[in-house]
Amino acid sequence: MEVENGTRENVEAVLKEMLQRKSFSKYKFVLISMHPEELRHLENRQVRVETRVWYGDSRKALRRFAWLKLRAAMIIDENLQIQKKASNTIHVYLSHGSPVKSIRESYNCTPDTDYMLSQAPFWNPINEYELRIPVERMVTLGFPRNDALFSDKSDLLNLFDQKFNKLVVWYPTFRQHRIHEAVIPQHSSFSIPLIHDEAAARRINELAAQYGILLVVKPHPVQDLSLIRELQLDHLIFIYDDFFVSNGITAHDFLGKTDALITDYSSIIFDYLLTGKPVALTIEDYEQYKEQQGFAIDFKMLKSCSTILDTPEDFAAFFRDLVEGNDPLKEKREEVMRLTNTYLDGNSTKRVVDWMEELLQRPR
């Protein structure tokens, strides 16, 4: 099982469900990660954590990795795929989100992928083109991670010291990589839409405070956070992957308890639509993205069901509507939600593991 921080919620949900079932007690689970130290707490007699191996590593490590792949009954991944070595191994790609941005030139399913989870039939031709995987290999059962959106972890809002009436989470797409240059060059030293300097950040913080909003920004895992970390504001705060780890929750546990989402070109929007809560988009660099990376979908669909934020005044109006309970785009969001999500019941993990259990019982 491939487990990487920031894109591991589907795999973790499946692992937890499997460990609870007697039918999986005969299997050993090997978690492969570039950051194994983050997963040591999961180890027991049935679960082992090992370091991801790459070409150029020691021969001993490469032989060990090859041996594990040869012995695997099933390979389960959702980001950095692990190619199988034995023809009777079942390779399932759980996906880490339905594509908004075009990824055809940067990310594809490996040819040995036997099955891929598709969020809904709507996505099948899109996944086929973007990920270069045949439609007949796609299975629609729902994303396991989305079950957490329906969970009842009522204590999550006690994770912050600030007092607030509404909690809004902001998921911006990365624009400034820690190592490489940004995919889309930005004039913002903060690398977040509409927050181009400290003054802009303070203005949005003031508006959030005015309406009793706690605005929590979750930057992309690979984004350069060096300047953002220096901000010390009371109603515009930043959280990182370690926030979820240290509090023993997943990103989707947290998402389910928020009151609204702000994002841009992230696939998280299609998951969040399941909550029925308001969504806003910050897309000031839309034309750049469209020209340089392109989109996997017709972006008009997202514009039609989301509030567009271009100025601080737009933030103020969005906050005001949220506090006053005005939701003019509710019906349109539901329409898009039903198009892009087949399952709305919070039982996707069970469905996926039931299906995997049946796969493993087939003659191979």
Question: Where are the predicted features?
Answer:
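Catalytic donor nucleotide-activated moiety binding site of glycosyltransferases and closely related
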Residues: F29-V47, W170, A201-F244
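A nucleotide-sugar donor-handling region in carbohydrate enzymes
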Residues: V100-R104, P111-I195, P221-V222, E324, ...
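A donor-sugar binding/catalytic signature common to diverse glycosyltransferases
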Residues: M74-S95, P99, N247-Q293
